Swiss-Prot record:
Protein name: Dephospho-CoA kinase
PROSITE patterns (alphabetical): DPCK
EC number: 2.7.1.24
Cellular component aspect of the GO annotation: cytoplasm
InterPro entries: Depp_CoAkinase, P-loop_NTPase
Organism ancestry: Bacteria, Pseudomonadati, Pseudomonadota, Alphaproteobacteria, Rhodobacterales
Keyword Transferase carried by entry: yes
Organism: Ruegeria pomeroyi (strain ATCC 700808 / DSM 15171 / DSS-3) (Silicibacter pomeroyi)
Gene: coaE
Length: 197
C-alpha cells in the first residue's frame, strides 16, 4: 500500500530541506516547483502554449520567470491565464510520478497545497513551521528578494497557522536535528500503520 503525504508550508519555513529528509528515510519525492521548472525549460511541455499566450515570455526557447513576473505585475488577470496553462500540466507530471514511483511513502512537496485543494488527494499532510520573525530572517538572508516582495508573497499564501491547523503533522524546523527527528517519527508512524491511507 502506497501512502501519499502532502508536504506544505509558507516561504522560508524549511520545506525543501525537510523534503530531502524524507528522501533520506527512503520516501520518493515529487516537488511542485521542480515540476514547473521542467515544464518551463527548453523542450518543456509549457513552452509552446505559453509562447502562444504570451510570446514575450519565451526567451531562448524557455519560459522566463522574470518576464512572467513582469507580465503579471502589468496585468493581474494574466495570472489566471498562466495558471490555466500550467496547472493541468503540473497535474499530469504529478500523476506520472504517482503511477511510476515504487517507494512505500510518496511525499508531494506543494507550497500551495491547501490553496489549490490538493490535500484531497493526500492520505495525510505535514506542514513545516517556524515563528514569523525567523521566517522573515531566513528569506532576507537568501538575498534573492526585497522585504516588499517577501511580504507580497506571504500575503498571497494562506497564513501558516491555518496550514498547520489543517495538517495532520506539524514539523518545527528550528534546528536540523529537531526537524530530522520529527520526520523520522512521522515515517515510523506511517510504516507502523498508525496513520492509515
Amino acid at each position: 500500500m502506497t501512502f501519499r503525504l502532502g508536504l506544505t508550508g509558507s516561504i522560508g519555513m524549511g520545506k525543501s530541506t525537510t523534503a530531502q529528509m524524507f528522501v533520506d528515510e527512503g520516501c520518493a519525492l515529487w516537488d511542485a516547483d521542480a515540476a514547473v521548472h521542467r515544464l518551463y525549460s527548453s523542450g518543456g511541455a509549457a513552452v509552446a502554449p505559453m509562447r502562444a499566450a504570451f510570446p514575450d515570455a519565451v526567451v531562448d526557447d524557455a519560459v522566463s520567470r522574470p518576464v512572467l513576473k513582469h507580465i503579471i505585475a502589468e496585468d493581474p488577470q494574466a495570472l489566471k491565464r498562466i495558471e490555466a496553462i500550467v496547472h493541468p500540466l503540473v497535474a499530469e507530471d504529478r500523476a506520472r510520478f504517482r503511477d511510476s514511483a515504487t517507494a512505500d511513502i510518496l511525499v508531494f512537496d506543494i507550497p500551495l497545497l491547501f490553496e489549490t485543494g490538493g490535500e484531497a488527494a493526500m492520505d495525510a499532510v505535514a506542514c513545516v513551521s517556524i515563528p514569523p520573525e525567523e521566517q522573515k530572517a531566513r528569506v532576507m538572508a537568501r538575498g534573492t528578494m526585497t522585504e516588499a516582495q517577501f511580504e507580497q508573497i506571504r500575503a498571497k499564501q494562506m497564513p501558516n497557522e491555518e496550514k498547520c491547523a489543517r495538517s495532520d503533522f506539524v514539523i518545527v524546523t528550528d534546528t536540523l536535528d529537531h526537524a530530522r527527528a520529527q520526520v523520522q517519527d512521522i515515517v515510523r508512524q506511517i510504516r507502523a500503520g498508525n496513520i492509515h491511507a
